Amino acid sequence: MEYLYTERAHLMCPGMSFGITAEVSAPFDEKRIKDSFAVLAQAHPFLKALLGHDRRSNAYYYDITEISKTELIIKKKMLADLEDAEILREFERLTGYEWNLFNEGMLKASAWKIGETGERTGFLLVFHHLLTDGRGALGLAQELAEYYARGKKPEYAPERLISAENTFPDKNRMPLISRMLVNTANSDWKREKHDPPDYSRYRDFAGEYIKSNKPFHALSRRSREEVKAMTFSCRENGITVNDLLIAQMMTEEGADKIIIASDLRSRLPGYNSGSLGNYSTAFSIEIKKKHKDIYELAKAIHKKVQKTLNDPAALYLILNCYESLEPPLLDASFISVRGCYNSKAAKFIGTMFFGFASPSGHSITNLGKTESVSMTKAYFIPPASPAIKKTLGILTVNGEMTICTSERLHIQMGATGDKERGFHIDSPKQKY
């Protein structure tokens, strides 16, 4: 049985669902679609899981059942291509409320006919963050495409999560100040003697929060030629494409700090290859010095990124915080900041560590590049964390890069946005 450990940070935090869209080079076949998701569930136990709770220990776990818990929706409407606005509208519908994970699975999927005759099939996979991270989601989408188009079955990959016994590499100890703050918050929490936050009460509050804080999504594209030019210029300057994208975001948003997601699979000895679960961290890069040249800014970013990647204490900082905080204190951090729970200790952590008081941060998650005959197109819809103002989700498939923006809008309770969700081709402002 797998228990929530560092994943606990995603349990009582709204807006943490995200999506992968995929266009598969095989005709629409409803029976084949249903069979494909059944096959995925046989390979990945978490697709058959609900949320479980041990009241005595207040531990949450993945309660694996006998059947798939994926909610599959077969759409009748035919779409011209994967960039149809209908897909983003469907994502916003499926993420427009807080899922009840005691009764609902952690994956919801929709499927459409793509093309004039349905000669291709389009999928939207919507993941709760407790199921997996972006890299795991992309892997599942690739397995779906390979089985649906070519009949290639995924290998059985039971999940083996980060745990107290299966923890991080050496030299990842938190800095002294962070340890002191965490220890103080834990002590204050114990002195407050609160009952643990109730999941159902959290869901009621989170549902209202989501209604009044709907994110807006938009897409932009970089053609194969543009991606090639970008890659060449980055190599010439000794930086990565991601360094350049971060520099562009800093420049366009006027931001000094960007939060970056980083995959840890190759660093975790306990990771079971191909399995679902969360095996990523996040860290921030701050550049206060102004740079007129975007490549000089990207070079400064590159140095800071590489320094963090080579410093376990910095790389694992946020995961160490999740691991070290009292679990109910972690549960209460968001709702305490938002006034639904009265804990000074949790409010302090939610404000100072996680930034829940106001969504002012910027972040970027790049799932890299992949080549696939079966999955001809895809893009990544990043989560809209309540701590983040704007997030970029980046995925390059068969040489074409798609950037999806999740930007949180502050609107009145019960109102709905009237902006058209959909695909637009955004010409790059930077010439390469």
Write out the residue ranges for each language-model feature.
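Hydrophobic/aromatic-lined pockets within catalytic cores
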Residues: 132, 145-152, 235, 249-254, ...
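Short, well-structured alpha-helical interface segments that form or flank functional binding sites
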Residues: 135, 139, 240, 244, ...
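Acyl-thioester-dependent condensation/acyltransferase catalytic cores
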Residues: 41-135, 139-142, 146-150
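Acyl-thioester-dependent acyl-group transfer interface
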Residues: 1-59, 82-107, 254-432
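A generic structural signal for alpha-helix starts
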Residues: 27-28, 131-135, 239-240, 292
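Non-catalytic, low-complexity flexible loops and terminal extensions
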Residues: 1-10, 18-21, 131, 135, ...
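Gly/Ser/Thr-rich phosphate-binding loops and adjoining beta-strand/alpha-helix segments
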Residues: 13-32, 103-124, 205-269, 401
